[in-house]
């Protein structure tokens, strides 16, 4: 481990992956910039990254380094309910602690590069924006999943197809992560993890780059009469606020030379916050037959398909016959207009349905609006657990 102190942040810092192929270069000169190479070939040109405080102050531009520390990571991570029981995570890491009470970590693995900002001072901090202007080149092909809400782009279900487009020809609207860019020698996928008290990242194509955008902090909430779902009615002019020390989300740029490597990349899991709930033995993962997927439409049956006992009984039979561990009761099993999850509709005959599912060794998952269950979390979980959910 090498530690140095009180350096002016003008010199570039380089971090290289354990296999020596991937490297990240960080500069804290006029602006804070990060670039990425694979075997010496540029994947991402120098790209500005920063946090913006009140009055537009940039935390990392021309910042002075109080301490730089290099270290290597080599740890076995237990991964219950992952595609493997455990995996080994290796990385080389640079940790820069600044004189202004902030810091920055950059690490390189054989699977890509990641960075995160952090704060060491203990006062109240308001983040007005985060800068992430990733320069890949105007002609680079990107796969973007755009927001489906034109009126309120950041309020949507994060469900869309991916559009293949040159960055310079992309639509002028935000896309949600993951986003993948073809950089010729390899593909780079933008990801994030360990997001606590902070908005998720969107990106918008901007010439030759993908520029991050973030939802502003809610100022005033309201409820839709239908569903009882809360929504943001008015926002602040900042994106996050917190007290004391804080670690900001990891920004991950996963590097893959073969598309089959994409779903095997472990960086999101490895850099996520460690398990805080203790034992996970009570969690039973599994596949599910999902009513919403085909809108309850069943053909060739001798009953009226819909949100009712016979339909879900049919789903249970299907799940049992095909080795699926669960069925989902999506929206409609309780009256959405009343937004009371303690009162299932009579047509579902939930107690009978649970009994039938238990006989078939199929579990039931109940879908709800997020804030509706939050408001009765302990009561609802206790009630339905006692029923056999």
What is each of the regions a protein language model found here?
Residues 239, 243-318, 322:
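An acidic-aromatic substrate-binding cleft motif
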């Amino acid at each position: 481990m090498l530690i140095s102190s009180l350096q002016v942040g003008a010199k570039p810092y380089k971090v290289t992956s354990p296999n020596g192929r991937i490297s990240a270069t960080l500069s804290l000169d006029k602006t804070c910039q990060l670039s990425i190479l694979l075997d010496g070939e540029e994947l991402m040109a120098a790209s500005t990254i920063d946090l913006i405080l009140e009055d537009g102050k940039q935390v990392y531009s021309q910042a002075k380094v109080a301490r730089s520390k290099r270290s290597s990571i080599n740890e076995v991570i237990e991964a219950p309910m992952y595609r493997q029981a455990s995996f080994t995570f290796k990385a080389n890491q640079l940790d820069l602690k600044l004189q202004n009470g902030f810091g920055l970590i950059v690490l390189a693995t054989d699977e890509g590069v990641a960075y995160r900002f952090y704060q060491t001072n203990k006062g109240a901090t308001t983040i007005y924006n985060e800068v992430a202007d990733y320069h890949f080149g105007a002609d680079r092909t990107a796969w973007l999943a755009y927001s489906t809400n034109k009126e309120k782009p950041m309020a949507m279900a994060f469900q869309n197809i991916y559009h293949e487009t040159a960055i310079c020809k992309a639509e002028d609207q935000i896309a949600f992560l993951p986003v993948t860019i073809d950089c010729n020698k390899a593909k780079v996928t933008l990801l994030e993890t360990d997001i606590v008290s902070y908005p998720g990242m969107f990106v918008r194509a901007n010439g030759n780059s993908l520029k991050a955008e973030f939802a502003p902090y809610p100022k005033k909430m309201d409820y839709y009469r239908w569903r009882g779902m809360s929504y943001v009615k008015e926002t602040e002019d900042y994106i996050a606020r917190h007290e004391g020390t804080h670690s900001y989300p990891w920004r991950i740029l996963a590097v893959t030379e073969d598309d089959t490597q994409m779903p095997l990349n472990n960086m999101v899991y490895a850099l996520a916050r460690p398990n805080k709930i203790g034992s996970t033995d009570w969690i039973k993962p599994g596949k599910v037959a999902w009513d919403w997927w085909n809108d309850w439409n069943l053909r060739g049956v001798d009953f009226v398909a819909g949100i009712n006992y016979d339909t879900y009984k049919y789903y249970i039979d299907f799940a049992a016959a095909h080795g699926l561990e669960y069925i989902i009761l999506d929206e409609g099993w309780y009256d959405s207009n009343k937004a009371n999850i303690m009162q299932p509709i009579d047509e579902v005959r939930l107690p009978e349905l649970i009994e039938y599912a238990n006989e078939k060794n199929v579990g039931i998952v109940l879908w709800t609006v997020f804030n509706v269950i939050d408001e009765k979390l302990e009561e609802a979980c206790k009630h339905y657990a006692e029923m056999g959910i």
